[in-house]
Amino acid sequence: MMRALWTAASGMTAQQYNVDTIANNLSNVNTTGFKKIRAEFEDLIYQTHNRAGTPATENTLRPLGNQVGHGTKIAATQRIFEQGKMQSTNLLTDVAIEGDGFYKILLPDGTYAYTRDGSFKIDSNRELVTSQGYKVLPNILFPEEYIQNSITISEEGIVSVKIDTSNEPIELGQIEISRFINPAGLSAIGSNLFKETAGSGQEIAGIPGSEGMGRLRQGILEMSNVSIAEEMVTMIVAQRAYEINSKAIQTSDNMLGIANNLKRQ
C-alpha cells in the first residue's frame, strides 16, 4: 500500500509537468515561429518477484513473470518542428522560411543562435537585425540613400534595394539559413532563439532553396504551430490522469487506515 502511494504520486508529478508543458504551448499560440512541445513519459524501475522462464516446479517453467512497477516520470520534452501557418504582413523586412532551416543570429557575447522568427528590422546602423536587435548573418548593410519601399528579398535570400540616384536595384548580400540533423536537440534560450547542442549536431549552412533548405517568403511571417483545440483536448486528458492518480492515493490511504484499525477490532 505504501508503494501504491508513491507510485500514484509519481503519476501526479508527471501529469503536472505535462500540464505545465501544455500551458506553455497555449501561452505561445501567437508567438512568431514558435514550435509546440510534447511531454514524453517512461515507466520507472520494476520489482521482480518471479522471472518468466524460471522453474515453477521440477519439470515446468514459468510462462509469465511477476513484476510490480513503481510509477512513471517525464522522459523528455519533444519539440515538434512542423511548419506553422503563413500570415501575410506586407512588411518588406518580414521573411518566413517555408521548409527546413533557421536564421543564424549573432548574440552580443559573440556566440551564435538560431531562430525561425523572421520579423526583421533595420537598425540605426542600417543593418538587418531581429526584433531584439541581434544581427542577422551574413550581415546585410543598407546604404544611406536606399529607398525604403524598394527592399526585395528573393526566395533564395538575395537582398536588393534601389537608391535615390539609380532606378536599378543593387544587391546587398544574401541571407543564408542553417539546418540540423536533429533540430529537436536544439536548446531553447528564450526570445524565439535556439542554441546548438551535441544532440542537435553541428549546423549545416546553405542557400535557401538548395540542399534541402527551405525557401524564403518576403512579406510573410510563420506563426506558431500550436493548435488550441488539440492542446485543450490534451489538457483534459492530463487533468483526468492527474485526478485518477489522486484517487489512487486516496484509495491506498483508506486501505492503510483499514489495516491500522485491525488491531482495535
From Swiss-Prot:
Q: What is its main location?
A: other
Q: What is the annotated signal peptide range for this record?
A: none
Biological process according to GO:
bacterial-type flagellum-dependent swarming motility
**GO CC terms:** bacterial-type flagellum basal body, distal rod
Q: Which keywords does UniProt give here?
A: Bacterial flagellum
Q: Name one Pfam family in it.
A: Flg_bbr_C
- Location in or out of the cell: Bacterial flagellum basal body
For this protein, the record's InterPro entries field holds: Flag_bb_rod_N, Flagellar_basal_body_rod_CS, Flagellar_FlgE/F/G, Flg_bb/hook_C_dom, FlgE/F/G-like, FlgG_G_neg, LlgE_F_G-like_D1
Superkingdom classification of source: Bacteria
Q: Which family does it belong to?
A: Belongs to the flagella basal body rod proteins family.
Cite the NCBIfam families for this sequence: FlgEFG_subfam, flgG_G_neg, PRK12816.1
Q: How does it assemble?
A: The basal body constitutes a major portion of the flagellar organelle and consists of four rings (L,P,S, and M) mounted on a central rod. The rod consists of about 26 subunits of FlgG in the distal portion, and FlgB, FlgC and FlgF are thought to build up the proximal portion of the rod with about 6 subunits each.
Q: What is this protein's name?
A: Flagellar basal-body rod protein FlgG
Q: Which organism is it from?
A: Borreliella burgdorferi (strain ATCC 35210 / DSM 4680 / CIP 102532 / B31)
Lineage of this protein's species? Bacteria, Pseudomonadati, Spirochaetota, Spirochaetia, Spirochaetales
Which gene is transcribed and translated to give this protein?
Answer: flgG
